[in-house]
Amino acid sequence: HLAPSGILYPRYAIFSRQAAFETGGNLRMPLFVKPLRSDASLGIGGKSLVHDAVALMERVTFIRKELNDSALAEEFIDGREFYVGVLGNSQPKALPPVEVDFTGFPEGAPKVLDSKAKWDERSKEFKGTKSVLATLPDELRARLQKVAVDAYRALRVRDYGRVDLRLTDTGDIYVLEVNASCYLERSSEFAMSATAAGIEYPKLIERIVELALERYKR
């Protein structure tokens, strides 16, 4: 659904539990390998970034056996990572982008938010990353927001969602994920973006409920 809209995303292959193989193109290493259906970085760790076929099959086997899931292998897109929240249905609006700051990440480690970086408060990965409101030129901010809204529309997301993006050194913007049910705690990146747009947390939740109700009234 993204390709017809001119939206960039990593080329990929799917390794199902039944050993079938699907591909979105000829893949180039390194690849980022993760469970197809899980969330919250479950199954993502230090061995998720693979550089050869042997490591790829080891990771696929781990996901199949230990997590009982199919594996998704994507070409790794290096660059700055942004989260762009989107609100709305017929006229979705993008919120201010949030950037993942990897400044304190362990040296040499791939810039990926794995399970340690998200949940293990004692880890170097957790301590070395933080989400901050992105400081960007107006033109770049507008580009990120446009890609987010285009992806949101293309996948027919409703009410609210978050689009995860990577900006390469050459200025290309790739969609890594479109999360139609993203984390909504008061401390979440989505809430941070909404606050920056002048929408306080109670109003944000109220607006999401209103958007859902409007759909059912039509």
What are the roles of these predicted feature ranges?
Residues 53-146, 167-174:
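Phosphate-binding site of ATP-dependent enzymes
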